[in-house]
Amino acid sequence: MWLSILAIFCGAGLGALLRTGFNLLSVGVASVIPLGTLISNMVGGYLIGIALAFFGNNPHLSPEWKLLIITGFLGGLTTFSSFSAEVVTMIQRGEFTWALGTALLHLVGSLVLTLLGIWTYQAIK
């Protein structure tokens, strides 16, 4: 149990650091939508597709690897709460079109990139 907790803890810390890096890189970039959150969710969507395909094809790996990568790292990288707060802020400012566009971009983009990640793994396997 302690190894599982450690795997999640380490993965989440690394994922959160990468998300912070994406946010810092997007500071000063002229954009109506928060790019750091979008990049985090798109990269996370792609990587989880690869991870799902990888772990599905490698069931012999210890469960701690899946906890490290999917639950920890990708859980720390992707951010539904920040996305939700940003969209609600747009709605509160009356930016309904931007709010809808941002929500659709995150949802559709993440789903498409998850599929692309699965297909990428299958192509290189």
Curated annotation (Swiss-Prot):
| Keyword Ion transport carried by entry | yes
Q: Which Pfam families match?
A: CRCB (PF02537)
Task: Enumerate the residues binding Na(+).
Answer: 75, 78
- Give any single GO term for biological process: cellular detoxification of fluoride
Q: How is its activity regulated?
A: Na(+) is not transported, but it plays an essential structural role and its presence is essential for fluoride channel function.
Membrane topology of the entry:
Multi-pass membrane protein
Gene Ontology terms for molecular function: fluoride channel activity; metal ion binding
Q: Which reaction equation describes what this protein catalyses?
A: fluoride(in) = fluoride(out)
**Record's superkingdom?**
Bacteria
Name a GO CC annotation attached to this entry.
Answer: plasma membrane
Write the record's keywords in alphabetical order, separated by commas.
Answer: Cell inner membrane, Cell membrane, Ion channel, Ion transport, Membrane, Metal-binding, Sodium, Transmembrane, Transmembrane helix, Transport
Q: Where in the cell is it found?
A: Cell inner membrane
Transmembrane annotation, as ranges: 2-22, 35-55, 68-88, 98-118
Q: Which family does it belong to?
A: Belongs to the fluoride channel Fluc/FEX (TC 1.A.43) family.
What is the recorded function of this protein according to its Swiss-Prot or TrEMBL entry?
Fluoride-specific ion channel. Important for reducing fluoride concentration in the cell, thus reducing its toxicity.
Kindly provide the name given to this protein in its UniProt entry: Fluoride-specific ion channel FluC
User: What organism does the record attribute this protein to?
Assistant: Polynucleobacter asymbioticus (strain DSM 18221 / CIP 109841 / QLW-P1DMWA-1) (Polynucleobacter necessarius subsp. asymbioticus)
Which gene name does the record give? fluC
